[in-house]
């Protein structure tokens, strides 16, 4: 049986924490006892998440041990480096749980997709996860700390999706990146896993036409879209020692879609 407060001593860094899956992950990790460093490109959104957790909402005033909001563009190496420095300065330790949820879509058919739309999605969804994974791992290794890194991919990274060449490529890359990181970092006591959501009710999927959603729902054996909390459940398991011998895994949270 899973024990309560499985993450009582953990410091968790969550990117994309201002909405959707990232916010749900932040809430769930906090309920399990973790202190959450909630990061988002939108500082106000990150602060709102921290307010929901009962924290301070700004890295400038939060004492060590309080849930705290941070702002960073994960596609920029300097910003990610500063983020890890700020988190460590605030809490006097590196995050032992790192969850990369930051992502975006710029959908278009392959024949019409612009180079800018391709580049931006790859920069945030794939390069951003590389930068966060690298910086977090460097901080953990230099401190001699164990950790769990969880990267949010997508089932689309395995099967593709019409109109999402850039998104599918970025999410497929996340799977390969995470598996390789798991091979390299295991000897340091750092586990790396990816979570592959299916169609989840988030601000991102709210842009999808209803007729498309109806078609997708008809393909899901469980008969409905997932909730962000469903993804948060999987992330929490991978963050905890309940999954202590799991690394390099890709956990699908899809309701059975594309089995």
UniProtKB/Swiss-Prot annotation:
Substrate binds at residue 154. Its EC number is 1.1.1.n12, 1.1.1.62, 1.1.1.239. GO terms for molecular function: (3R)-hydroxyacyl-CoA dehydrogenase (NAD+) activity; estradiol 17-beta-dehydrogenase [NAD(P)+] activity; NADH binding; quinone binding; testosterone dehydrogenase (NAD+) activity. GO terms for cellular component: mitochondrial envelope; mitochondrial matrix; oxidoreductase complex; plasma membrane. It catalyses: a (3R)-3-hydroxyacyl-CoA + NAD(+) = a 3-oxoacyl-CoA + NADH + H(+); 17beta-estradiol + NAD(+) = estrone + NADH + H(+); testosterone + NAD(+) = androst-4-ene-3,17-dione + NADH + H(+); 17beta-hydroxy-5alpha-androstan-3-one + NAD(+) = 5alpha-androstan-3,17-dione + NADH + H(+). InterPro entries: NAD(P)-bd_dom_sf, Sc_DH/Rdtase_CS, SDR_fam. The active site is at residue 167. It is found in: Mitochondrion matrix. Pathway: Steroid biosynthesis; estrogen biosynthesis; Lipid metabolism; fatty acid biosynthesis; Lipid metabolism; mitochondrial fatty acid beta-oxidation. Pfam families: adh_short_C2. It comes from the Eukaryota. The keyword Glycosyltransferase does not apply. Heterotetramer with CBR4; contains two molecules of HSD17B8 and CBR4. Required for the solubility and assembly of the heterotetramer 3-ketoacyl-[acyl carrier protein] (ACP) reductase functional complex (KAR or KAR1) that forms part of the mitochondrial fatty acid synthase (mtFAS). Alpha-subunit of the KAR complex that acts as scaffold protein required for the stability of carbonyl reductase type-4 (CBR4, beta-subunit of the KAR complex) and for its 3-ketoacyl-ACP reductase activity, thereby participating in mitochondrial fatty acid biosynthesis. This is (3R)-3-hydroxyacyl-CoA dehydrogenase. It comes from Canis lupus familiaris (Dog). The gene is HSD17B8.
